[in-house]
Amino acid sequence: MDLLYFFLLIWPPYVANGSAVLANKFKIRHPIDFGKTFVDGRRIFGDGKTYEGFLIGLSTGTFIGYAPNLLYKHLSLLDAFVLSIAALLGDLFGAFIKRRLCMPRGYPAFPLDQLDFLLTSLAVYTLYKDISVEYIIAAVIITPLIHRITNYIAYYLRLKKEPW
Protein backbone atom coordinates (compact mmCIF):
# COMPACT_ATOMS: atom_id res chain seq x y z
CA MET A 1 0.00 0.00 0.00
CA ASP A 2 1.26 3.45 -0.95
CA LEU A 3 0.69 5.42 2.28
CA LEU A 4 1.20 8.76 0.57
CA TYR A 5 -1.50 7.99 -1.99
CA PHE A 6 -3.76 6.71 0.81
CA PHE A 7 -3.37 9.97 2.74
CA LEU A 8 -3.94 12.08 -0.39
CA LEU A 9 -7.04 10.04 -1.24
CA ILE A 10 -8.76 10.42 2.13
CA TRP A 11 -7.61 14.00 2.80
CA PRO A 12 -10.25 15.88 0.68
CA PRO A 13 -13.26 14.07 2.21
CA TYR A 14 -11.84 14.46 5.71
CA VAL A 15 -11.29 18.20 5.19
CA ALA A 16 -14.72 18.69 3.60
CA ASN A 17 -16.55 16.81 6.35
CA GLY A 18 -14.54 18.34 9.17
CA SER A 19 -14.60 21.95 8.04
CA ALA A 20 -18.37 22.20 7.49
CA VAL A 21 -18.70 22.62 11.26
CA LEU A 22 -17.09 26.06 10.94
CA ALA A 23 -20.49 27.36 9.79
CA ASN A 24 -21.66 26.95 13.40
CA LYS A 25 -19.85 30.21 14.14
CA PHE A 26 -22.14 32.15 11.79
CA LYS A 27 -25.00 33.98 13.48
CA ILE A 28 -27.36 33.36 10.58
CA ARG A 29 -27.45 29.96 8.91
CA HIS A 30 -29.72 28.63 6.19
CA PRO A 31 -30.79 24.98 6.56
CA ILE A 32 -30.49 22.96 3.37
CA ASP A 33 -33.96 21.52 3.96
CA PHE A 34 -35.46 25.03 4.46
CA GLY A 35 -37.06 23.74 7.67
CA LYS A 36 -39.27 21.37 5.67
CA THR A 37 -40.41 17.99 6.90
CA PHE A 38 -40.47 14.63 5.15
CA VAL A 39 -43.61 12.49 4.74
CA ASP A 40 -42.99 11.10 8.23
CA GLY A 41 -43.38 14.58 9.72
CA ARG A 42 -39.73 14.87 10.76
CA ARG A 43 -37.21 17.33 9.37
CA ILE A 44 -35.49 16.17 6.19
CA PHE A 45 -31.97 16.95 7.43
CA GLY A 46 -32.32 19.27 10.43
CA ASP A 47 -30.79 22.60 11.39
CA GLY A 48 -27.27 21.17 11.48
CA LYS A 49 -27.03 20.88 7.70
CA THR A 50 -26.73 24.35 6.20
CA TYR A 51 -25.81 25.91 2.90
CA GLU A 52 -23.01 27.76 4.65
CA GLY A 53 -21.56 24.52 6.03
CA PHE A 54 -21.91 22.79 2.68
CA LEU A 55 -20.12 25.60 0.84
CA ILE A 56 -17.37 25.84 3.46
CA GLY A 57 -16.89 22.07 3.32
CA LEU A 58 -16.89 22.00 -0.47
CA SER A 59 -14.43 24.86 -0.88
CA THR A 60 -12.01 23.76 1.85
CA GLY A 61 -12.26 20.11 0.86
CA THR A 62 -11.54 20.98 -2.75
CA PHE A 63 -8.73 23.48 -2.29
CA ILE A 64 -7.10 22.41 0.97
CA GLY A 65 -7.77 18.80 0.01
CA TYR A 66 -5.98 19.37 -3.27
CA ALA A 67 -3.07 21.42 -1.87
CA PRO A 68 -0.70 18.50 -1.06
CA ASN A 69 -1.05 17.40 -4.67
CA LEU A 70 0.76 20.52 -5.79
CA LEU A 71 3.85 18.63 -4.61
CA TYR A 72 2.89 15.00 -5.10
CA LYS A 73 0.58 15.03 -8.15
CA HIS A 74 -1.62 12.05 -7.22
CA LEU A 75 -5.02 13.75 -7.46
CA SER A 76 -6.33 16.46 -9.74
CA LEU A 77 -8.35 19.45 -8.58
CA LEU A 78 -11.40 17.72 -10.10
CA ASP A 79 -10.65 14.60 -8.02
CA ALA A 80 -10.53 16.71 -4.84
CA PHE A 81 -13.81 18.38 -5.83
CA VAL A 82 -15.54 15.04 -6.51
CA LEU A 83 -14.24 13.49 -3.27
CA SER A 84 -15.36 16.58 -1.32
CA ILE A 85 -18.85 16.97 -2.75
CA ALA A 86 -19.50 13.23 -2.46
CA ALA A 87 -18.38 13.34 1.19
CA LEU A 88 -20.82 16.15 1.94
CA LEU A 89 -23.65 14.37 0.13
CA GLY A 90 -22.85 11.23 2.12
CA ASP A 91 -23.04 13.24 5.32
CA LEU A 92 -26.43 14.62 4.23
CA PHE A 93 -27.62 11.08 3.56
CA GLY A 94 -26.49 10.10 7.05
CA ALA A 95 -28.45 13.01 8.55
CA PHE A 96 -31.50 11.96 6.54
CA ILE A 97 -31.26 8.40 7.92
CA LYS A 98 -30.77 9.68 11.48
CA ARG A 99 -33.91 11.83 11.21
CA ARG A 100 -35.90 8.82 9.95
CA LEU A 101 -34.67 6.85 12.99
CA CYS A 102 -35.81 9.70 15.31
CA MET A 103 -32.25 10.51 16.36
CA PRO A 104 -31.83 14.13 17.42
CA ARG A 105 -29.17 16.42 16.00
CA GLY A 106 -25.77 15.60 17.45
CA TYR A 107 -26.84 12.15 18.65
CA PRO A 108 -23.95 9.68 18.19
CA ALA A 109 -24.79 7.01 15.63
CA PHE A 110 -21.88 4.63 15.10
CA PRO A 111 -20.89 3.78 12.36
CA LEU A 112 -23.18 6.09 10.38
CA ASP A 113 -21.56 9.34 11.55
CA GLN A 114 -18.04 8.05 11.07
CA LEU A 115 -18.31 6.36 7.71
CA ASP A 116 -21.18 7.89 5.70
CA PHE A 117 -19.06 10.71 4.29
CA LEU A 118 -16.04 8.57 3.53
CA LEU A 119 -17.76 5.56 1.97
CA THR A 120 -19.92 7.78 -0.24
CA SER A 121 -16.85 9.71 -1.30
CA LEU A 122 -14.86 6.61 -2.18
CA ALA A 123 -17.85 4.95 -3.89
CA VAL A 124 -18.40 7.95 -6.17
CA TYR A 125 -14.68 8.23 -6.88
CA THR A 126 -14.55 4.58 -7.96
CA LEU A 127 -17.07 5.39 -10.69
CA TYR A 128 -14.24 6.90 -12.71
CA LYS A 129 -10.99 5.84 -10.96
CA ASP A 130 -9.83 2.50 -9.62
CA ILE A 131 -9.14 2.20 -5.90
CA SER A 132 -7.70 -0.96 -4.42
CA VAL A 133 -9.93 -2.61 -1.82
CA GLU A 134 -7.07 -2.43 0.69
CA TYR A 135 -7.33 1.39 0.65
CA ILE A 136 -11.05 1.24 1.38
CA ILE A 137 -10.57 -1.28 4.19
CA ALA A 138 -7.77 0.78 5.72
CA ALA A 139 -9.93 3.91 5.56
CA VAL A 140 -12.84 2.12 7.25
CA ILE A 141 -10.53 0.93 10.03
CA ILE A 142 -8.81 4.23 10.84
CA THR A 143 -11.68 6.67 10.22
CA PRO A 144 -13.65 6.02 13.44
CA LEU A 145 -10.55 6.77 15.52
CA ILE A 146 -9.69 9.90 13.56
CA HIS A 147 -13.34 10.97 13.66
CA ARG A 148 -13.45 10.66 17.45
CA ILE A 149 -10.22 12.59 17.94
CA THR A 150 -11.20 15.43 15.61
CA ASN A 151 -14.67 15.68 17.17
CA TYR A 152 -13.15 16.09 20.62
CA ILE A 153 -10.84 18.79 19.27
CA ALA A 154 -13.81 20.59 17.65
CA TYR A 155 -15.74 20.31 20.92
CA TYR A 156 -12.90 21.80 22.96
CA LEU A 157 -12.54 24.59 20.40
CA ARG A 158 -16.30 25.20 20.86
CA LEU A 159 -17.04 24.44 17.23
CA LYS A 160 -19.37 21.59 18.24
CA LYS A 161 -21.86 21.27 21.08
CA GLU A 162 -21.18 17.57 21.62
CA PRO A 163 -17.83 15.75 21.71
CA TRP A 164 -18.95 13.01 19.29
Swiss-Prot record:
InterPro entries: CarS, CarS_archaea. One of its GO terms (cellular component) is plasma membrane. It comes from the Archaea. It is an enzyme of class 2 (transferase). Keywords: Cell membrane, Lipid biosynthesis, Lipid metabolism, Magnesium, Membrane, Phospholipid biosynthesis, Phospholipid metabolism, Transferase, Transmembrane, Transmembrane helix. Its main location: membrane. It is found in: Cell membrane. GO terms for molecular function: CDP-2,3-bis-(O-geranylgeranyl)-sn-glycerol synthase activity. Pfam families: CarS-like. Pathway: Membrane lipid metabolism; glycerophospholipid metabolism. GO terms for biological process: glycerophospholipid biosynthetic process. The chain crosses the membrane at residues 3-23, 51-71, 77-97, 122-142. Disulfide bonds: none annotated. It is a multi-pass membrane protein. Its cofactor is Mg(2+). It catalyses: 2,3-bis-O-(geranylgeranyl)-sn-glycerol 1-phosphate + CTP + H(+) = CDP-2,3-bis-O-(geranylgeranyl)-sn-glycerol + diphosphate. Catalyzes the formation of CDP-2,3-bis-(O-geranylgeranyl)-sn-glycerol (CDP-archaeol) from 2,3-bis-(O-geranylgeranyl)-sn-glycerol 1-phosphate (DGGGP) and CTP. This reaction is the third ether-bond-formation step in the biosynthesis of archaeal membrane lipids. PANTHER family: CDP-ARCHAEOL SYNTHASE. Belongs to the CDP-archaeol synthase family. This is CDP-archaeol synthase. The gene is carS.
